[in-house]
Design a protein with these regions (language model features):
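ALDH superfamily catalytic-core signature
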Residues: 53-60, 80, 93-231
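Rossmann-like NAD(P) dinucleotide-binding subdomain of oxidoreductase/dehydrogenase enzymes
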Residues: 1-130
Length: 232
């Protein structure tokens, strides 16, 4: 007979602050586990609203708990605590490795550092391919693992001037601005660009070149025009 895990910790990311934690929370509850939710710092309010809704729906507060805290020693204590029987993590591979280092024997259900791609072959409808690639890559300002951040061009598509022109036109016509403006296609990133993201927006690797070079559009570093590099 299956024995439920007594306590599951759910550590969702900020980019889908309701849908992703809701999946982990309800799955754990359905299997008989109590749940502690430790939201990403950028999405603490969203997590609070979600849990309020679940409490109002009848989930006991001592079965579903919000652990609203900043990163640090308390987070480590939560993840490493022996009472925790399972941890659900959609996030980066570095975060998964960090959590595993804190407690190597902890069962970890993780989806980490996804990299989505669109493959365009010579038989493809190039108009449709350009539209799909641009919408997938730059929707949500590219801040999701399902964003097609990599386009793989096969055969003649790789040298097609028509495809490149259409791609450049489509990218350059995207409207960048406030998410409160319904005309906006690309909004701000969640935090000012830094580290690997800043390097990706400003520097090229060996053999790479800009098809469309991204530009910083605000003083803070959260609003950028979309960019495309080739020769990756």
């Amino acid at each position: 007979r299956p024995v439920p895990v007594a306590l599951t910790v759910v550590t969702p990311p900020w980019n889908f602050p309701v849908a992703i934690p809701c999946g982990g929370i309800t799955a754990a509850l359905a299997t008989g586990s109590s749940v502690i939710v430790k939201p990403a710092p950028q999405a603490r309010r969203s997590a609070a609203v979600l849990l309020e809704a679940l409490w109002e729906a009848g989930v006991p507060r001592d079965v579903l708990v919000l652990c609203d805290m900043v990163e640090g020693d308390v987070s480590r204590h939560l993840v490493a605590h022996p009472a925790v029987g399972r941890l659900i993590l959609p996030g980066s591979s570095s975060t998964a490795a960090l959590f595993s280092s804190w407690r190597p024997d902890l069962p970890l259900l993780a989806e980490t550092s996804g990299k989505n791609a669109i493959v365009v072959t010579p038989s493809a409808d190039l108009d449709l391919a350009v539209g799909d690639l641009v919408r997938s890559a730059f929707g949500h300002a590219g801040q999701k693992c399902s964003a097609a951040s990599l386009g793989i061009l096969v055969g003649s598509v790789a040298t097609s001037e028509r495809f490149r022109r259409q791609l450049v036109d489509a990218v350059q016509t995207l409207r960048v601005g406030s998410p409160m403006d319904p005309r906006t296609h690309v909004g701000p990133i969640i935090e000012p660009a830094q580290g690997r993201l800043l390097a990706a927006l400003t520097t090229l690797g060996e053999g790479e070149s800009w098809l469309v070079e991204p530009r910083q559009l605000d003083a803070e570093g959260r609003l950028w025009s979309p960019g495309v590099r080739i020769g990756v």
